[in-house]
Amino acid sequence: MWNLAGKELSSRLLLGTACYPSLEHMQQAILNSGTEVITISIKRQTSAGLDGESFWQAVKKLDCHFLPNTAGCRNAEAAINTAEIARELFDTHWIKLEVIGDDYNLQPEPFELIKATRILIDRGFEVFPYCTDDLVLCQKLVDAGCKILMPWGAPIGSGKGLINPYALETLRYRFPDITLIIDAGIGKPSHAVQAMEFGFDGVLLNTAVALANHPALMATAFRHAVIAGHQAFTGGMMSERNVAHPSTPLIDTPFWHQVNNL
């Protein structure tokens, strides 16, 4: 069990609800993942014939905590307004704060992100800020009152994994008491394992499952990956060595090498 913003959870995997081939694929993937927290975009647009009302009914049946996000917002004002709508709609003070500053890599706009964070925290929100792995930006968010940081592993939807391991490990070292969740860029279960081995508290992903050939099966794979990575970290992994070291103890010289003095 772990505590996320006052909620006791079993799963350290958070899952998005966008881009699935159908509602049925989405529901089964979420069930297979074992997640207890799903993200939902307030500005979500239905596509591929999916009915909006059917979507809401589907997610309500999943018995998960909702983490609404401000996807699509490009300044603090828009993000704050969206967060207020989300709080009223979902009856939650949780908000995944996204303020995008660039269309090419969907990198967060740091100045607007910090501005929105300060205002939302003052208004009683628990802010889950989508940010980069920049140490100074993360420190500013913590200074603004964030208890949770959600740095990217790579640009949203890229599937490139953890492109700057050093920066992510540095965040874990510098913020030992902050909840750290990798958000964006995860493409394979092995990426999730790596994030958890770094000591991150959780992983949030969407595209890697939604666009898989078999979303439900991929969700199962990520479920086990997150568990394996976390157990590896808590179990205490051996340190790397520059030279070989025998794994079998040599108590004495093998009998066939001993000199027969008889």
Curated annotation (Swiss-Prot):
Subcellular locations according to the entry: Cytoplasm
Pathway, per record: Cofactor biosynthesis; thiamine diphosphate biosynthesis
InterPro entries given in the database record: Aldolase_TIM (IPR013785), Thiazole_synthase_ThiG (IPR033983), ThiG (IPR008867)
UniProt catalytic activity: [ThiS sulfur-carrier protein]-C-terminal-Gly-aminoethanethioate + 2-iminoacetate + 1-deoxy-D-xylulose 5-phosphate = [ThiS sulfur-carrier protein]-C-terminal Gly-Gly + 2-[(2R,5Z)-2-carboxy-4-methylthiazol-5(2H)-ylidene]ethyl phosphate + 2 H2O + H(+)
Class of the enzyme per the UniProt entry, highest EC level: transferase
Entry GO MF terms: thiazole synthase activity
Keyword Transferase attributed: yes
EC numbers on record: 2.8.1.10
One GO term (biological process): thiamine diphosphate biosynthetic process
GO cellular component: cytoplasm
Main location: cytoplasm
Active site: K96
List of residues binding 1-deoxy-D-xylulose 5-phosphate: G157, A184, G185, N206, T207
Alphabetical UniProt keywords: Cytoplasm, Schiff base, Thiamine biosynthesis, Transferase
Main function: Catalyzes the rearrangement of 1-deoxy-D-xylulose 5-phosphate (DXP) to produce the thiazole phosphate moiety of thiamine. Sulfur is provided by the thiocarboxylate moiety of the carrier protein ThiS. In vitro, sulfur can be provided by H(2)S.
Family designation: Belongs to the ThiG family.
Quaternary structure and interacting proteins, as annotated: Homotetramer. Forms heterodimers with either ThiH or ThiS.
Protein name: Thiazole synthase
Gene: thiG
